[in-house]
């Protein structure tokens, strides 16, 4: 085994899934919000404004969770196979775990909620996000999370609710009826559930409905 790149982060909110890009020439890497980006990025699609420009004062988490974590939070990078070139393509996740490509080579992920925030105005459910170039999904520590209606923050394709995301995979190539071959399958550890997410084009992105599979 050869170490290609040491990443500062680990554990439940560390680096997670690694998959091939559609052209099979590079890798996509997703990491949780306790994982620092490499000190030197070769490219960054996200504007620098997508950092700590909060309009309202922020209240840190009362139990101390992620108090020192700042933008970009969780992230997705495109990486060369030798680990030398890193390009940030999307950020603002809490703890997205799996990555999956649909039949059109579009990238999706399943992001985690902060369960301690449940019932507060700033609670954000687990959700499926369409990982587009330069996208920002607005995770910030404490009460500073960007609502989905902020112009700079993309909305999810679908909110799932409380849970704990693990894997994600499309049914492409499976011996299923067409509807299920096109579905995104997301795994929730908390409730031991696999959901089939049926995505419908909506403008430049998608909206989804869920079905317990």
Question: What kind of region is each of these model predictions?
Answer:
Residues 1-213:
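Beta-propeller domains with acidic blade repeats across secreted/periplasmic ectodomains
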